[in-house]
Amino acid sequence: MAIIPDKQDGTVLERQEKKLKPPSMYKVVLLNDDFTPMEFVVMVVQEYFNKDRETATQVMLKVHREGRGVCGVYTRDIASTKVEQVVTHARQAGHPLQCVMEEA
């Protein structure tokens, strides 16, 4: 805590130190469906989550086998943007791929 003299009346003010907490983090999750090709899921993971082909394939297999796969953990704004980008791309390509974000 810093002590700051007040030049007007000679009183001393104490500056409150602000405690900043880290931002909340969110998982971006792909959900399985019976129609989106596996290769499309791999491409999405590579393109939007900057994963190499091997990692993207592992995420795709997790989605396929377990019904869901985490692509990454991000701050709220970044996670929301990635979800929107993935869903938009999937719809433009004619696929029903679902992408959601959940608190980490």
Curated annotation (Swiss-Prot):
GO biological process, one term: proteolysis
Record InterPro entries: ClpS, ClpS_core, Ribosomal_bL12_C/ClpS-like
A Pfam cross-reference name: ClpS
Residue stretches spanning the membrane: none
Family of the protein in this entry: Belongs to the ClpS family.
Role, per record: Involved in the modulation of the specificity of the ClpAP-mediated ATP-dependent protein degradation.
Oligomeric form and interacting partners: Binds to the N-terminal domain of the chaperone ClpA.
Name recorded for this polypeptide: ATP-dependent Clp protease adapter protein ClpS
Native organism: Paraburkholderia phytofirmans (strain DSM 17436 / LMG 22146 / PsJN) (Burkholderia phytofirmans)
UniProt gene name: clpS
